[in-house]
Amino acid sequence: PIRSLIKASSPAVKPAVVKRPSFREKQFQAREDAILSVVNRILSTKGYDLMTMDEVAAEVGIAKPSLYKHFDSKEMLAATAMTRLLDRALLQINAQAVEQPALDSLKAVLRWALTAHLEGNMPLLPSTRSTIRQALINHAPYVERLIQLTDAIGQWIQQARKEGQICKSVPDELVMFTLFARACDPTLQFLRETGQYTNAQIVELMVQVCFEGFT
């Protein structure tokens, strides 16, 4: 009944007309994608504090004023790149089968994050003193996706605990922050530099140590 009342009182909605982007709009979007790819790589290697707008513009191959047509500040640029990262993480989370054990879902998402790190696509986490932290907090799209991400991972952690896969004495926050930290762990690079392991082997070793320890 309530749904019927809402439907009856709502004005008829005309189907939206999908406007095809113009050539200029496609160019603008392609340039923006290139900018964010460069930013993602710089954040993965140097971090936010050492990144400069001059460096981004030079690597993309555009003038600095052109860069500011897309992003009016370094903070907005980094916040947009981090938001895209969370979008990719949420795609991985949503790809996990509902009937899959929670611990397996956590492992699968960690594998994705570790692989992204080894491929140079995982930005370094901002430190507690980094100036990007406030910019991220003020960027609504980032906060919205971060809440979705932490809610999903938090539910898996609680379910895995109920299933006896995670120690009851370990707080949920510690488990979650540990998973986040593993995605940016320099151990990945150290293992790769030995030349003894493939990327796939490194990922599995890290997952094993994270969830099973050294025993």
Which positions does each model-derived feature cover?
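C-terminal peripheral helix-coil segments that are non-catalytic and often amphipathic
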Residues: 1-19, 108, 112-115, 151, ...
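Basic, helix-initiating cap at the start of DNA-binding domains
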Residues: 1-46, 50-59, 76
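Alpha-helical structural segments
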Residues: 30-41, 45, 58-59, 76-96, ...
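Short hydrophobic/aromatic patch on the recognition helix
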Residues: 61-71
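Short, Lys/Arg-enriched C-terminal cap helix and immediately downstream tail that follows
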Residues: 79-80, 187, 215
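Amphipathic alpha-helical packing segments from all-alpha helical-bundle domains
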Residues: 90, 136-163, 173-177, 181, ...
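Amphipathic alpha-helical segments used for helix-helix packing
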Residues: 116-137, 188
